[in-house]
Every structure is written in C-alpha cells, then in structure tokens.
Amino acid sequence: MPQVFKIGPYWVYFWANEQDPLEPVHVHIALGAPRENATKVWITRRGKCLLCNNNSKIPETVLRNMMRIIEARSSEVIEKWKGFFGTADFFC
C-alpha cells in the first residue's frame, strides 16, 4: 500500500485496491503495518479532515492530533493521491 507518511508508530496510507468508481480522496491510518478496513479519514476540497470511521480504535486524543497533522499536510496527500490514482474527487 502506498505510504503517504508516518506519524509516530502510525502509518498514513492509501489502500491501493480501491473500488471502481474511485472513492473521493481519503487516507487510512493504522498502527504498524497497513491493513484493510483501518481507520478512514476523508480529505475535503479545503484540506480539512472528516472522520469516516475509527476501525483501528485509535484513542480519541491521538486521532485528533493525527488529523491536525494530516490537515497541515493535506496538499501533499492530495498530490500523492493524484500521482497514484491519476485523479482526485472530494467528499465535500
């Protein structure tokens, strides 16, 4: 799975086996190795994060801090998404 970056022991990554049609820009977050059905965060047009689910059961304060970092690096996330998937649509 394409790793976008790491935040401490957590991976922030794209799941390469996305559905067709391609879902809007989002990242998954998991402790240790990437895995299917990990925590999912949508990236909005304005670079904000919206929590889709917390399947990885990341503690709330940790997740909130990670989402702030992802927002600060959202342009990097979007560019990497476009580079990997060839297009970028947004949830909102």
Model-predicted segments: where are they?
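Negatively charged, low-complexity tracts enriched in Asp/Glu with abundant Ser/Thr
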Residues: 1-14
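Alpha-helical interaction segments
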Residues: 4, 16, 71-75
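Residue-identity detector for glycine
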Residues: 8, 32, 47, 83-86
